[in-house]
Structures are given as structure tokens and as C-alpha cells.
């Protein structure tokens, strides 16, 4: 594992949480001084196995990532004017380092989402979550200590011209080399009567994305689900589905052999993503299907809004409610479950099975 987690092993500790992984270098260390600013404000972040980051906040006014910036190493100042895409990327490791970047890295490590040699299709819907995920993955790929490849995949399920233009414009602004392919999903969902259009749309989207990603030689697709999605889904399954289950950080595809789905923003809170978008003056696409344009409320969206409201209300009495919901799914005690299944295809087991076995002993 040295090749993956490098510095963590040498420091004798496992990088278990997003916070607390970094050490501040002493400015007096000549080898780590910034020649552009004389060592003022140099900070060396040691992010085990995912690329070292040196951020200079001194008079040099430049940022060197992984120590690989030639201009910075040789003492030449880089142009201070950065593109919107560069500013958005830089903000991930500066202003939003704790709230976004560290949590993104923490999720990738804790759940082993990315491995050497992976070819990952980042699936971009045009919303804030997937767009920010794409920038995180782009930055990580540049400075990771092990090689992996990334494709930026956009499916057009029937967007209106203005909505598609918004996605393309944001991709240009963020300097994301997207691949766009088309599917008839909106038209199909629009004609289906009854059932949940959001559920059907999500299932069809995933199938098309798996298929296109596999055709590009990818072994994983990355989706933009975040911390809030996880806890809201957990509550929805209990209150609306009469079962206890959650959104996993990764899973194997059942219909596409060798393919996996990963959720690198698993530990990132939605408020951080919203703030990042506003900070960089970005406007993202909302749900743009024809069904929701004609309907004031639809079942799944309404239920999710209700979960947001419920969690916010409970947090007024206990500020740790959200993290406790999240952690509860990491600490399930099956011995206290009246009934359980070990997967969607498994039969329902009762606590009486083992209870009666103990009586016979």
C-alpha cells in the first residue's frame, strides 16, 4: 500500500478522517522555501499518496501544486491573472480546502473509491454537484501519486437548447473536456403513465451512462451524490419505504460486468458545494425534464424536500442529528433487528431463526 498511501504509512498513522492530515512546514527549512517570496507564508500540505500540495501565500502570490510548478521552483513569478476555471480549481484547495477538498479526499480514501489504473467516467448532469465533482476529479488526476484516467461524460436526455447551452458554457468556463452523447430518456419518461418519473428517469440514465462509459473503456462511473443525499435517502427509506437502507459509497453494476459506481462526494456537505458555486459566480442547471416543468410537485422531490425540512428542524434541538444519521448506517447491529435481508435478492430473515437455535443448545 506504500505506493497508494505513501506518506501516511511513513508517518505511522492511517488517514482515517478528512481533517487533520496536514502538517505545516517550517519556513526556516531552506529546501521548502519559496524562492519567489523568500519563504514567506509557505505551507506544505501532506495529503498521503494523493499528491503533495505546496500553497504559497506570501509575496510571490503564486501556487505550486505537488512541487511540480517549474516557474515557482525557479523563482519566476507566474501571471497573476488566472482564468475562471483555474480560479474555481484553486478555490477547492484554498478557500474550500476543509469543507470540500479534504472531505473529497477522505471519501476516496476511506471507501477505496479510486485505484491505480482506473479509468473513470465522471457523469455530469449539469447540476452543481456533478460539475464540482468533475473539477475535484480533474485536480486530483493532475497531482495524484498513482495513475488513473478520467473521462467527463454528459448525457443529453432531451434538454431544451438553452439548458444544453448552459451545460456547455459551464464546461468551457471550468475547462472541462466533456463528451456529450444523446438519449431519448425524457421522451420515454414523458409518455409513461403512473409510477415515479424520477425513479424511472434515474434508472434509465444510469443504464445509458454505464453503457457509454464501458464503450469508452472505463471501469467506473462517478456520480455527484453528497453527504446530504445520503442521510436524506436513509430517512426516506424508513419513512416512505418501510425499510432501512442507505446510499452506498460504491457498488458493483448488476447489468454491466466489471463496472462499478462510485460516489466521491460522500463526505461533502451540500452547503459547501452551494457556497463554492456562488463564490465562483457559476449558475448551474436544475432538474430540466419536461415532467417537472409541468408539475408543481412530484413525489420523490417532495419527499426529499420534506426530509431536508425535518433534518433542519431536528438540528435546532441536536446539532449532531445529521452526522448521527450518517454514522448510524456505519454501525448497524443486526442482533437487534427483528428482520433483515443480506441484499435485494435475499429472502427476509427473522431474529427467531437464531433465537430458536439457542433454545435447542
Predicted features along the sequence, with ranges:
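The feature marks non-catalytic terminal segments
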Residues: 282-361
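Functionally engaged cysteine thiol sites
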Residues: 1, 52, 197-204, 287-296, ...
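Basic/polar N-terminal segments that are highly enriched at the extreme N-terminus
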Residues: 72, 78-79
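Short, low-complexity intrinsically disordered segments enriched in small and basic residues
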Residues: 2-38, 44, 49, 53-69
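Short, basic, helix/turn surface patches
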Residues: 202-216, 250-256, 309-328
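A structural signal for well-ordered alpha-helical scaffolds and beta->alpha junctions
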Residues: 97, 101, 164, 206, ...
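Catalytic subdomain that performs nucleotidyl-dependent activation
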Residues: 149-150, 228-310
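ATP-dependent adenylation/nucleotidyltransferase module used to activate substrates
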Residues: 10, 79-244, 248, 271-279, ...
Amino acid at each position: 500500500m506504500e505506493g497508494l498511501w505513501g506518506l501516511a504509512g511513513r508517518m505511522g498513522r492511517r488517514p482515517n478522517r478528512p481533517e487533520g492530515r496536514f502538517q505545516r512546514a517550517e519556513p526556516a527549512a531552506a529546501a521548502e522555501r519559496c524562492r519567489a517570496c523568500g519563504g514567506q507564508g509557505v505551507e506544505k500540505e501532506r495529503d498521503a499518496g494523493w499528491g503533495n500540495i505546496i500553497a504559497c501565500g506570501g509575496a510571490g502570490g503564486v501556487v505550486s501544486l505537488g512541487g511540480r510548478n517549474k516557474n515557482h521552483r525557479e523563482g519566476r513569478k507566474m501571471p497573476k491573472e488566472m482564468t475562471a476555471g483555474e480560479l474555481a480549481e484553486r478555490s477547492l484547495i484554498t478557500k474550500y480546502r476543509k469543507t470540500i477538498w479534504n472531505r473529497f479526499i477522505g471519501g476516496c480514501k476511506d471507501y477505496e473509491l479510486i485505484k491505480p489504473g482506473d479509468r473513470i467516467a465522471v457523469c455530469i448532469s449539469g447540476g452543481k454537484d456533478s460539475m464540482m465533482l468533475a473539477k475535484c476529479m480533474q485536480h486530483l488526476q493532475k497531482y495524484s501519486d498513482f495513475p488513473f484516467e478520467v473521462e467527463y461524460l454528459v448525457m443529453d436526455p432531451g434538454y431544451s437548447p438553452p439548458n444544453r447551452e448552459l451545460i456547455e458554457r459551464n464546461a468551457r468556463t471550468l475547462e472541462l473536456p466533456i463528451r456529450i452523447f444523446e438519449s431519448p430518456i425524457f421522451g420515454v419518461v414523458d409518455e409513461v403513465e403512473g409510477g415515479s418519473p424520477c425513479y424511472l428517469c434515474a434508472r434509465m440514465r444510469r443504464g445509458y451512462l454505464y453503457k457509454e462509459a464501458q464503450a469508452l473503456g472505463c471501469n467506473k462511473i462517478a456520480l455527484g451524490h453528497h453527504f446530504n443525499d445520503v442521510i436524506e435517502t436513509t430517512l426516506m427509506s424508513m419513512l416512505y419505504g418501510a425499510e432501512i437502507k442507505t446510499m452506498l459509497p460504491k457498488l458493483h453494476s448488476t447489468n454491466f460486468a466489471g463496472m462499478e459506481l462510485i460516489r466521491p462526494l460522500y463526505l461533502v456537505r451540500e452547503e459547501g458545494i452551494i457556497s463554492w458555486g456562488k463564490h465562483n459566480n457559476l449558475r448551474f442547471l436544475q432538474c430540466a425534464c419536461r415532467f417537472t416543468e409541468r408539475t408543481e410537485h412530484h413525489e420523490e422531490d417532495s419527499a426529499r424536500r420534506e426530509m431536508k425540512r425535518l433534518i433542519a428542524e431536528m438540528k435546532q434541538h441536536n446539532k449532531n442529528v445529521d452526522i448521527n444519521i450518517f454514522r448510524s448506517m456505519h454501525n448497524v447491529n443486526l442482533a437487534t433487528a427483528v428482520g433483515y435481508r443480506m441484499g435485494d435478492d435475499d429472502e427476509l430473515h427473522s431474529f427467531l431463526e437464531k433465537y430458536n437455535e439457542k433454545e435447542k443448545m
